[in-house]
From Swiss-Prot:
EC numbers for this chain: 1.-.-.-
GO molecular function: heme binding; iron ion binding; monooxygenase activity; oxidoreductase activity, acting on paired donors, with incorporation or reduction of molecular oxygen
Gene that encodes it: CYP4
Protein name: Cytochrome P450 monooxygenase CYP4
CDD domains: CYP503A1-like
Family the entry assigns: Belongs to the cytochrome P450 family.
Originating organism: Pyricularia oryzae (strain 70-15 / ATCC MYA-4617 / FGSC 8958) (Rice blast fungus)
Membrane association type: Single-pass membrane protein
Main function: Cytochrome P450 monooxygenase; part of the gene cluster that mediates the biosynthesis of a tyrosine-derived cytochalasan acting as a fungal signal recognized by resistant rice plants and leads to avirulence in Pi33 resistant rice cultivars. The first step in the pathway is catalyzed by the hybrid PKS-NRPS ACE1, assisted by the enoyl reductase RAP1, that are responsible for fusion of the tyrosine precursor and the polyketide backbone.
A Gene Ontology term for the protein's cellular component: membrane
UniProt xrefs under Pfam families: p450 (PF00067)
Spans traversing the lipid bilayer: 46-66
Requisite cofactors: heme
Length: 534
C-alpha cells in the first residue's frame, strides 16, 4: 500500500511541483494539474485507492482526535450543543450565564456571544483588531464566494459618492421602480399570486442593477437572473461545506462552488464590454472631475467613482469586475429580506398602506418624490424600522473576526481567530426597551421621533445600541442609506399602485442558519391587485 501511495501519488506530485516551480503557479493551479493527471493518467485502482485513503483518514482522525477539541484561552464559560444553529445555544447560555459573555458552539462555528451591555466597547474596537468583513469572509468561504473581500476603495465609494448621489437620483430610481414593476408584477385587475421571496429578490436585483450597471444591463434578463441567483448559489455551496467533514471539505469545496463560479463568469462576460468603454473614457479624459458628477439623463458613473479612488496599478478590469459582483451580491439579499418582511407585514396591516398613502400625498408633486434622502416619510420610515426590528436578517450584530488579541472590561480575553458577536435579539425583543416587544406597531418609532429632541433619532437608518440591524461605529453597514432609499421608493410605488394581501395568514417559518443568520420563509405567496388610480 505504501509503495502504491509513493509511486502513484507522492512521486508524480513532486515531479509536477518541481517542473512547474518556475511558473510560480498557485496551489489551486497545481491542484488542477494533479487532478487531470489523476483522472486521465491513472488507472481505476489508483482513484479508488485515493478515495478509500481519504475515508480511512477521516475515520482515524475522528477516533483519535475527535474528542480532543481545544478551545482558545478566553476565560469564558462554554455552551455547546449538536444544533446546526445558535437559537437554542443562546437561550441556554442566557439561562446559565445571564448578562455575561460565553462561548457558544454549534456543529460548525464557535462564537463568543456578548450581552448588549458590551455594545459600546465592542463597537469601538478598530478594524485592524476585529473585522466584520473578515467575519463575513470566514462564514461564507470568501476565498471562493468573494464575500468579505471588499476593498477599502469600494467601501469608501459606497459610503461617500453613492450616498451623496442618492437625492438627485430619486426621479431616475422612481422610473427604474416603475419599469421593474411593469415587468415583474404588471397590471393586475384581479388578485395575482407571486412567491414573495423570489419576487422580492427579483425586484431589488433589477432596481439596484439599474443604479450600479445602468439601465441597459439592468434590463438584461441574464444579468438580473445572475444577480438573483448569486446569493442562492453561495448559500447552497456554504451549506454543503458546513455539512461536510473537515477532512473532506478542501477536496469538495471546488465542486460545491462550481455553480457560483459559473454564475460569476457569466456576470464577468456581461460586464466586460461596459467596463472596457468606461475605463477607456476615464483614461482619455483630462479633467476627470467632470466624469464624477452624476447627470440626471445618464447612468450613475459608478465605474468612474471607483477608478478615481484606485491607483493606476490597482484599477484593473479584474478588480472592477470583482467590485461589481460584490456590490451586487451585498446589496441584494439583505434589502430583499427587508422588503420581503415589510410586504408580509403590510399584507396583514392594510390600514398601514392608507396611512402611507396620505403621507406620500403631502410630499409628492405630480407623482414625483422629492429629491432628498426621503427623511420626510416619517410614517413609512417607522413602518420599515419596526419590520426590521421584528424580522432581522441575523440574530447577531457587531459580528467580528478577531485578528489581534483584546480584553474587555468584563475580563474576557479574546485571542486571534475567535469570532465575537452581540445578541441582537436581546435588544430587538427586550421588554425593558420596547413596550409589547413581540407586537408589530407601525408608529412605534414615529411616536418616539415626535418627542421633543428626538427628531434626529429613531430613524430606520440610525445606528445605535437600540438599533442593531445596521451594526454601529466605523464598521456599520456602508450601504444602509442606499438600501433605505431603495426600500422607500419601492414601498411608495407599491402602496400607490397596488393592494397586497395573503390568502394564508400564518407565522413565518424563517430558518435559522449555522452562522446565526435567518433564511426567509420561501413558501409564502403574496397577492397583488392594481388600484384604480385616478
Amino acid at each position: 500500500m505504501l509503495s502504491l501511495l509513493e509511486t502513484k501519488i507522492i512521486e508524480p506530485f513532486m515531479v509536477v511541483r518541481q517542473t512547474l516551480a518556475p511558473l510560480r503557479l498557485s496551489r489551486w493551479q497545481i491542484f488542477k494539474h494533479m487532478t487531470r493527471i489523476l483522472i486521465f493518467s491513472s488507472n481505476t485502482r489508483t482513484i479508488i485507492f485515493c478515495v478509500l485513503m481519504s475515508l480511512v483518514g477521516y475515520i482515524v482522525s475522528r477516533i483519535i482526535w475527535g474528542r480532543q477539541e481545544k478551545y482558545p484561552d478566553h476565560g469564558l464559560p462554554i455552551v455547546k450543543t449538536n444544533d446546526y444553529h445558535f437559537d437554542n445555544i443562546v437561550a441556554e447560555g442566557k439561562r446559565l450565564y445571564p448578562n455575561q459573555a460565553f462561548m457558544g458552539i454549534n456543529k460548525r462555528y464557535k462564537f463568543v456571544i456578548y450581552p448588549s451591555s458590551s455594545w459600546e466597547e465592542l463597537k469601538r474596537i478598530p478594524e485592524q483588531t476585529a473585522s466584520i468583513m473578515d467575519f463575513q469572509h470566514v462564514c461564507n468561504s470568501g476565498e471562493w464566494s468573494l464575500v468579505g473581500g471588499e476593498t477599502h476603495e469600494l467601501v469608501k465609494t459606497i459610503t461617500a459618492e453613492l450616498t451623496r448621489s442618492l437625492p438627485a437620483r430619486v426621479p431616475n430610481r422612481q422610473q427604474d421602480a416603475k419599469m421593474t414593476f411593469d415587468t415583474i408584477i404588471g397590471h393586475c385587475p384581479e388578485e395575482k399570486g407571486f412567491n414573495l421571496l423570489m419576487t422580492s429578490l427579483e425586484i431589488i436585483a433589477k432596481i439596484n442593477a439599474c443604479t450600479f450597471v445602468g439601465r441597459e444591463l439592468g434590463a438584461n434578463k441574464s444579468w438580473v437572473t445572475a444577480v438573483v441567483y448569486s446569493p442562492l448559489w453561495v448559500y447552497f455551496a456554504v451549506t454543503l461545506c458546513n455539512a461536510t467533514p473537515d477532512i473532506l471539505r478542501p477536496l469538495l469545496r471546488p465542486l460545491f462552488f462550481l455553480p457560483a463560479l459559473r454564475n460569476y463568469w457569466n456576470m464577468q462576460k456581461l460586464l466586460k464590454p461596459k467596463l472596457d468603454r468606461e475605463m477607456e473614457t476615464f483614461r482619455q479624459t483630462d479633467d476627470k472631475r467632470k466624469l464624477l458628477v452624476p447627470k440626471s439623463d445618464q447612468d450613475l458613473p459608478f465605474t468612474h467613482f471607483l477608478l478615481s479612488r484606485y491607483t493606476e496599478a490597482a484599477a484593473t478590469i479584474k478588480q472592477l469586475v470583482i467590485d461589481y459582483i460584490q456590490v451586487s451580491y451585498t446589496s441584494t439579499p439583505t434589502t430583499a429580506s427587508a422588503l420581503f418582511h415589510a410586504l408580509w407585514e403590510l399584507a396583514q396591516h392594510p390600514e398601514a398602506a392608507e396611512v402611507m398613502r396620505r403621507e406620500l400625498a403631502t410630499v409628492m408633486i405630480d407623482g414625483n418624490l422629492p429629491k432628498t434622502h426621503l427623511q420626510e416619510l416619517k410614517r413609512m420610515d417607522s413602518f420599515l424600522r419596526e419590520s426590521f426590528r421584528l424580522h432581522p436578517i441575523t440574530r447577531f450584530t457587531l459580528q467580528r473576526y478577531v485578528k489581534e488579541p483584546f480584553q474587555l472590561s468584563d475580563g474576557s480575553r479574546i485571542p486571534p481567530g475567535v469570532m465575537a458577536v452581540v445578541d441582537a435579539q436581546e435588544i430587538n425583543r427586550s421588554p425593558e426597551i420596547w413596550e409589547n416587544p413581540d407586537e408589530f406597531d407601525m408608529d412605534r418609532f414615529y411616536r418616539l421621533r415626535e418627542i421633543s429632541g428626538n427628531d434626529n433619532r429613531y430613524h430606520f437608518v440610525t445606528t445605535s445600541s437600540n438599533s442593531p440591524g445596521w451594526g454601529d461605529g466605523t464598521q456599520a453597514c456602508p450601504g444602509r442609506f442606499f438600501a433605505t432609499s431603495t426600500l422607500k421608493i419601492v414601498m411608495a410605488h407599491i402602496v400607490m399602485n397596488y393592494d397586497v394581501s395573503l390568502r394564508k395568514v400564518a407565522p413565518l417559518k424563517s430558518q435559522p442558519l449555522v452562522n446565526g443568520s435567518y433564511s426567509p420563509d420561501d413558501s409564502v405567496e403574496i397577492f397583488f391587485k392594481s388600484r384604480n388610480v385616478e
